[in-house]
Amino acid sequence: MIDLKVLRENPDAVRASQLARGEDPGLVDALADADTARRAAISAADNLRAEQKSASRLVGKASPEERPALLAAAKELADKVRAAESAQAEAEKAYSAAHMAISNVIIDGVPAGGEDDFVVLDTVGEPTALTDPKDHLELGESLGLIDMERGAKVSGSRFYFLTGFGALLQLGLFQLAVRTATENGFTLVIPPVLVRPEIMSGTGFLGAHADEVYRVEADDLYLVGTSEVPLAGYHSGEILDLSEGPKRYAGWSSCFRREAGSYGKDTRGIIRVHQFDKVEGFVYCRPEEAEAEHDRLLGWQRQMLGLIEVPYRVIDIAAGDLGSSAARKFDCEAWVPTQQTYRELTSTSNCTTFQARRLGVRYRDENGKPQTAATLNGTLATTRWLVAILENHQQPDGSVRIPEALVPYVGTEVLTPKN
């Protein structure tokens, strides 16, 4: 949820953010009206309760002659209190709905526009020049790494098996990510992949894209699409000690996405699938530290991409392509030779205080007063990285060279086709 102080002091900034996102600026006025109505309802109920308390004292002191009239007035006042409390509850409900409807306020400098309006911040390496390159699936099948056919037989479309060196390659990639994270002060966490509705909602994943989330209706739980969700919920309702700096976690988990809005897109291979694995960095910090921490997350992502030796670019995502929780997001996209384009391998989002406010995550400031924390997240490795590794490191004979940093984990320098 956005900070109401920002809404009250600078509603134009919130309207501008909504417009940049391509969302309804009228929601800002609706929230302002709901906030005013809620505060009025609270005040009215408080005043009536105070009046009721005074009336009760009068009844206790009243003479027998005065008592009947005072009791009748007290009963009438009790009815008014009940009505006022009911009105307050309705006002609170309307306010909460209006508050939840507004996306996070974007940070100054975020590009306006939609999916294609990103800004390229940096490009690293030259696109790999290959003659008649094979795509990752052809390579994966010839090397015995990926089995889509049996994945579909067992689970349906967009499922797969990673086998042999394919499994070792992913495991090695994740071990490298964990080593990178822990060397930089992250605590490794293997979180649950089923979460309660309030945690999924608190992170902003039950809004416009709720149809992308798998739900286990019998237990009223949701399968996570990223360990960002359980890690955001990890400290929900808590007051953190951030006096020694940010709290950084690296979550290793399986992730699940329905891809409901992706019909017909990336149907070949493992670029867009229903289940994959990921190591996700997650940070709690003071709001004033968030932008610097965002840059650090991006730096660790770039370090990982350097270790797997693929050409990539860094882009600043436009406001209309941001999730509701993100105030700014950077993506790192790797070159995919067979598609002759860059594809997303990482994203890192600065969610400012948006998620923490929903989830009740706070810290104590220098005066000991509880304040809302900021949260950030960023990919450190995921299954999709295998696409970039296989395609960029393929050799003319159909083999694939393993990046030097992964050789100790995979156990070989070259993967060769099976006969």
From Swiss-Prot:
Keywords (A to Z) from UniProt: Aminoacyl-tRNA synthetase, ATP-binding, Cytoplasm, Ligase, Nucleotide-binding, Protein biosynthesis
Localization in the cell: Cytoplasm
Reactions catalysed according to its record: tRNA(Ser) + L-serine + ATP = L-seryl-tRNA(Ser) + AMP + diphosphate + H(+); tRNA(Sec) + L-serine + ATP = L-seryl-tRNA(Sec) + AMP + diphosphate + H(+)
Membrane-spanning parts: none
GO term, biological process aspect, one: selenocysteine biosynthetic process
Involved pathway(s): Aminoacyl-tRNA biosynthesis; selenocysteinyl-tRNA(Sec) biosynthesis; L-seryl-tRNA(Sec) from L-serine and tRNA(Sec): step 1/1
Residues the entry annotates as binding L-serine: 226-228, 280, 379
Gene Ontology terms for molecular function: ATP binding; serine-tRNA ligase activity
Binding-site residues for ATP, renumbered to this chain: 257-259, 273, 344-347
Enzyme class: ligase
Superkingdom, natural source: Bacteria
Example of a GO cellular component annotation carried by this entry: cytoplasm
UniProt cross-references to PROSITE patterns, sorted A to Z: AA_TRNA_LIGASE_II
EC number: 6.1.1.11
Stored HAMAP family: Ser_tRNA_synth_type1
Function: Catalyzes the attachment of serine to tRNA(Ser). Is also able to aminoacylate tRNA(Sec) with serine, to form the misacylated tRNA L-seryl-tRNA(Sec), which will be further converted into selenocysteinyl-tRNA(Sec).
Complexes and interactors: Homodimer. The tRNA molecule binds across the dimer.
Record note on domains: Consists of two distinct domains, a catalytic core and a N-terminal extension that is involved in tRNA binding.
Family (UniProt): Belongs to the class-II aminoacyl-tRNA synthetase family. Type-1 seryl-tRNA synthetase subfamily.
PANTHER family attached to this UniProt entry: SERYL-TRNA SYNTHETASE
Protein name: Serine--tRNA ligase
